[in-house]
Curated annotation (Swiss-Prot):
Pfam families: SBF. One of its GO terms (molecular function) is symporter activity. This is Uncharacterized sodium-dependent transporter YocS. It is a multi-pass membrane protein. InterPro entries: BilAc:Na_symport/Acr3 (IPR002657), Bilac:Na_transpt (IPR004710), Na+/solute_symporter_sf (IPR038770). It comes from Bacillus subtilis (strain 168).
């Protein structure tokens, strides 16, 4: 069990690297990964099942302690990223399938990787976890409505079908995880250390499947999509941070909201695009998955070093006194 725990910890710590490696492999050897496309929803369901296994009462304490911060985080999550996605799609005159793909990822809840990045950034991790959890639980209703509102300009959208898909891929697996944890608490406590490894496998499988199935599209439109994804992600971080700052949240909470808004559940975006739209519509989600892990790591490192530098400065000033 110790070996699995160590492997799982290593996989979680190097998550972004594995996503990049398998994205490159999917692009270079597409025939090895295209078969995974049929199982994208299943892989996402496994990840969400793992989330259900790890949920606990403490995750909702922040909602009770500072409800307004959690509410602001969820509202920011579901307004900033969809609006930025729509603005980029409309302003840059993106092709319909790419526009819908960008809007899809923008309308998704926050990704669980944001909790890790917030922790590394010395941010308010409890707030990050609460916002991710609440936004994910609201996703079956909110995400389809937002997609219908913002994407109907380019392609027809069926919110009912999207609602059912999100129930199947997100909410039902989370509930199943909670039920399993309720009846098999001791067994789950022993197995929970392997969940980061399971999540990494699930995400790299989804990314490699989308990339391998869109090799030609990436050769034609990859640079455009990558540029839009970088803008989308970066503007999300900035506006999330400014929103929290304007509302006078403390600095750790500002960092949490910035990361929470900027990082999306791109696996859900890829699953919805694959099931309801074209393969090309899934590409922005796949690229977002690669990029936001890189940018999130860089931002977390910057903020972490800033905190350490400040602490070192205060220690030296105390010594001089």
């Amino acid at each position: 069990m110790d070996i699995i725990r160590k492997i799982s910890h290593f996989a979680g710590q190097t998550f972004g690297i594995w996503v990049i490696v398998f994205a490159v492999l999917g692009f270079s050897f597409p025939s090895l990964f295209t078969w995974i496309s049929s199982y994208i929803t299943i892989f996402l369901g496994i990840i969400m099942f793992g989330m259900g296994l790890t949920l606990q009462a403490d995750d909702f304490k922040e909602l009770v302690r500072k409800p307004w911060q959690v509410i602001i985080g969820v509202i920011a999550q579901y307004t900033i990223m969809p609006l930025v996605a729509f603005g980029l799609a409309f302003g840059l005159h993106l092709p319909a399938e790419i526009a819908v793909g960008v809007i899809l990822v923008g309308c998704c809840p926050g990704g669980t990787a944001s909790n890790v990045m917030t922790f590394l950034a010395k941010g308010n991790t409890a707030l990050s976890v609460a916002v991710t959890t609440i936004s994910t639980l609201l996703a079956p209703v909110v995400t389809p409505l937002l997609i219908m509102l913002f994407a109907k300009e380019w392609l027809p959208v069926s919110p009912g079908s999207l609602f059912i898909s999100i129930l199947q891929a997100v909410l039902f697996p989370i509930i199943a995880g909670l039920i399993v944890k309720m009846f098999f608490r001791k067994q789950v406590a022993k197995a929970v250390h392997a969940l980061p490894l399971v999540s990494v496998i699930g995400i790299v499988a989804i990314v490699s499947a989308v990339v391998s199935g869109n090799r030609e599209n990436l050769l034609q439109s990859g640079l455009l999509i990558f540029s839009v994804v970088i803008l989308h992600n970066g503007i999300g971080y900035l506006l999330g941070f400014l929103c929290a700052k304007l509302l006078k949240m403390d600095y750790p909470s500002q960092k949490a909201i910035a990361i929470e808004v900027g990082m999306q559940n791109s696996g859900l975006g890829a699953a919805l695009a694959t099931a309801h739209f074209s393969p090309l519509s899934a590409v922005p989600s796949a690229i977002f998955s690669v990029w936001h892990n890189l940018s999130g790591s860089m931002l977390a490192t910057y903020w972490s070093k800033k905190v350490k530098k400040k602490q070192a400065g205060s220690k030296s000033s105390n010594l001089s006194l």
